[in-house]
């Protein structure tokens, strides 16, 4: 019985943690999903962005008290403007997606929303990109990856 309880907690912790991508695995996935060069943004810039936003973690969340909103998933997409979490006041839901879908291990919906955001606002919509990637050599983010 104890073994079943421990096993249950183990599965629960894996489900809560989500998927943390390895850098090159994420590079290949983002390329496959069409982000390399999308709206002029290089794959290396997307990798830099996701490193600083979520450390490549699909389940990352960050609550923003000032706007009463939360950033979700590998791209840290905000519930005030882009997704619906059912609790953010006056949310816009610009991507027409549930915020929980942005935290799935299959990141296709998160990528689709990121494409929508970059199409409307550019890569500068992400504060982490402006702080850590803009005007930096980001080539190391894809260095050594077989793409």
UniProtKB/Swiss-Prot annotation:
Source organism per entry reads Bos taurus (Bovine)
Cystine bridges: 24-145, 48-133, 83-99, 95-113
What's the protein called, per UniProt?
Lysozyme C-3
Additional remark text? Lysozyme C is capable of both hydrolysis and transglycosylation; it also shows a slight esterase activity. It acts rapidly on both peptide-substituted and unsubstituted peptidoglycan, and slowly on chitin oligosaccharides.
Q: Which reaction does it catalyse?
A: Hydrolysis of (1->4)-beta-linkages between N-acetylmuramic acid and N-acetyl-D-glucosamine residues in a peptidoglycan and between N-acetyl-D-glucosamine residues in chitodextrins
Entry's EC annotation: 3.2.1.17
Q: What does this protein do?
A: Lysozymes have primarily a bacteriolytic function; those in tissues and body fluids are associated with the monocyte-macrophage system and enhance the activity of immunoagents.
Q: Which gene encodes it?
A: LYZ3
Keyword set, alphabetical order: Antimicrobial, Bacteriolytic enzyme, Digestion, Disulfide bond, Glycosidase, Hydrolase, Signal
Pfam families documented for this protein:
Lys
One GO MF term on file is: lysozyme activity
Q: Tissue expression, per UniProt?
A: Stomach-specific.
- Name all C-type lysozyme domain ranges: 19-147
Class of enzymatic activity (EC top level): hydrolase
Subunit note: Monomer.
Write down the InterPro entries for this protein, in alphabetical order: Glyco_hydro_22, Glyco_hydro_22_CS, Glyco_hydro_22_lys, Lysozyme-like_dom_sf
* Residue numbers annotated as active site: 53, 71
Q: What family does the Swiss-Prot or TrEMBL record give for this protein? A: Belongs to the glycosyl hydrolase 22 family.
Signal peptide positions are 1-18
Any GO BP annotation? defense response to Gram-positive bacterium
